[in-house]
């Protein structure tokens, strides 16, 4: 099963594609869709087209996107919601089922701790997907979304083959931190 994870943003939308076969997760690609410093409709169109292009290139079976949270600034929340809407429209128009997860669910599924930092997310994504480099925070969050969906949005303790895989490498999660 191929999963496209999306971390929506008006300026930068992260994406990550993974393949899942049983408990095995394989990295396919990741990156960001950057919007030009233009008017809102142009930015939303760029996000929509970027998602549509990813669907044509990678043919995902499923997708996962972060739910909108209420920010301190209501205007920022509205803009984020519009960027998320453009991404969802791209997914739906491409025939890709969409699952939604909160930031808490994402962090619990990937790191095992709901208040994990961006750096902890990046470290765990690198470990779980055996990446040679550290992805940007937006791409790491998108890959994390895909990982979260691959494991039903569950916590690290229910990830089946992932936790034993970390143990074989001498790694574990303690108080939300990856330790060796």
Swiss-Prot record:
Any GO CC annotation of this UniProt entry: Holliday junction resolvase complex
Residues holding Mg(2+) 2: 66
Enzyme Commission no: 3.1.21.10
Swiss-Prot/TrEMBL catalytic activity: Endonucleolytic cleavage at a junction such as a reciprocal single-stranded crossover between two homologous DNA duplexes (Holliday junction)
UniProt remark on cofactor binding: Binds 2 Mg(2+) ion per subunit.
Keywords: Cytoplasm, DNA damage, DNA recombination, DNA repair, DNA-binding, Endonuclease, Hydrolase, Magnesium, Metal-binding, Nuclease
Molecular function, one GO term: crossover junction DNA endonuclease activity
Cofactor requirement: Mg(2+)
Functional note: The RuvA-RuvB-RuvC complex processes Holliday junction (HJ) DNA during genetic recombination and DNA repair. Endonuclease that resolves HJ intermediates. Cleaves cruciform DNA by making single-stranded nicks across the HJ at symmetrical positions within the homologous arms, yielding a 5'-phosphate and a 3'-hydroxyl group; requires a central core of homology in the junction. The consensus cleavage sequence is 5'-(A/T)TT(C/G)-3'. Cleavage occurs on the 3'-side of the TT dinucleotide at the point of strand exchange.
Family the UniProt entry places it in: Belongs to the RuvC family.
The name this protein goes by in its record: Crossover junction endodeoxyribonuclease RuvC
Organism for this UniProt entry: Paraburkholderia phymatum (strain DSM 17167 / CIP 108236 / LMG 21445 / STM815)
